Amino acid sequence: MSNQVFKQNLDDKKGPQPGGPYLIQMLFKEPVEMPDKEKMTAIMEKHIGSTECFCYDKKMAGFAALDHVAEFQDGKCPVQLMVMGCDKFKGKGFDAFLMSQMWDCQEDRERIFRECKYQVVATDMLTAALPALERANLDADFLEALAELYPTCEAFYFQNCGKLLLAEDVRSHQIEGSDRFIRFGVNVRFFNIEGTEDMLIDTVGMSTLFLPDLQYHFHDMDPNWVVNHAYNVASYILEHDNPIQDGETIDGVADGQMCREIQWKCQYEDALIQPPRGVLDINMGNYASGGR
């Protein structure tokens, strides 16, 4: 665990924005060609359903996901999935703060950034107009198509949440449905509050779907229990389109397990740690820190 000291910076506008793109950086040791148009279209259709390739060259390929229609005030159209051509990867923008929260790749993150000199960037477009659950499943399907299209990919970086994962972990997962988005599109972060015994755990990535991220400010509980609670609550919020109202309670934790006998109160607040966003702050009762 890192002993580096970071400062709160809620003026940081560089971070992910609510409803922003689900942008994936695929990292490679060697340059890679754009797969041919027919192959890309076939694999996209296999994972996503009815697909139309509306642009294709060495620099970019674009696909309309015909089963996923975004509706706007002045009309509607299928959402788009874009894949860029291979480019050099210089590791810019990955500061110590971001690196400190790459929990899935702690053993490999420095090696990945050292060895991977090339990247392919992929992103969704117009998807902010979709319902949260539909977008979550589409983005997860898109990721699985990319993993199949680029077998030499070493690692995936998910810009919306700051997660870095080895490609083999993406390819070998056994997760189904919307929990795939929770696994790859939501990061649970952990911070010690300097000069105190307090800890802070929050999520980044739920706001991509216009859903609340979570925040816990606490002491004297195993942080791994809280991390598990955060992933479980995030999954519940996504699956049920955020049914939790301000001031309501949810099941707390006892001995590492969700427990109905313990109720923790929820309230909507602004995040304590960047990026600026709305969060569902979970008051952990006897374990809670900070004034509310």
Where are these regions (language model features)?
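Aromatic/basic-lined ligand-recognition segments
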Residues: 159-292
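Short, hydrophobic/proline-enriched secondary-structure or compact coil segments at domain edges
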Residues: 20-30, 116-127, 282
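N-terminal alpha-helical "arm" segments
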Residues: 1-44
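Structural alpha-beta junctions
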Residues: 45-56, 141-156, 236-245
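N-terminal low-complexity, intrinsically disordered segments
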Residues: 32-111
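Conserved aromatic-histidine-acidic binding/catalytic patches
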Residues: 25-28, 32, 127-135, 218-225
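Internal, hydrophobic cores of structured domains that mediate oligomerization or house catalytic pockets
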Residues: 84-187
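Short amphipathic alpha-helical segments
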Residues: 36-40, 131-142, 222-229
